[in-house]
Amino acid sequence: MKSGAEAHLVVDKIINYEKYPVTNANFYSNALNCAYFQESSTNGYAERRFAQTSEDVYDYISNNTTINVTRAYYTGSNVDPTNWNNGLYSAGEPLPSYLLKPTFPWDGNATQIINEINNGVFYVLHRDHGFENGWGDPYFDKTHIDNLTNGSLLPVVFSINCLTGKFLEDECFSEKFLRKADG
């Protein structure tokens, strides 16, 4: 935080989150997983484990809780995802049929992320590349945070990527989330 006022805002949000928890049960029943299927050679194999990690979380939550997890997954329009990464952390297994194009859209975007957060989700997970100002794909940056109107429906945000929490910057992406007064 760069000032006492900013610190006060964040501390007040934390206190209110604890003191006045969300009472709408739907909030705790919904979540959002965002990820990127990175693949540039168009052979259908993921180059990284981003979407697979998100899908592992999706599977665990879906199989062990009653939370409804919405997916906002993205890949290039010229990519036809067919297999997970064949590398250090995966053996190139085929994607489940429900994640294959055209059944699954693979077109997650900032509008979808904004709408899901504004409607109230308990958590947001993003797994992909990141930078000081936001997430790579689906692309979502600090300017999109200004469009959030979720008020007291504050999700836990798992920004599992590089640089989004680089607090040495003027105002990094994570800091923008924390500082937003009405969401």
Residue spans of the language-model regions?
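Cysteine-dependent hydrolase recognition
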Residues: 1-183
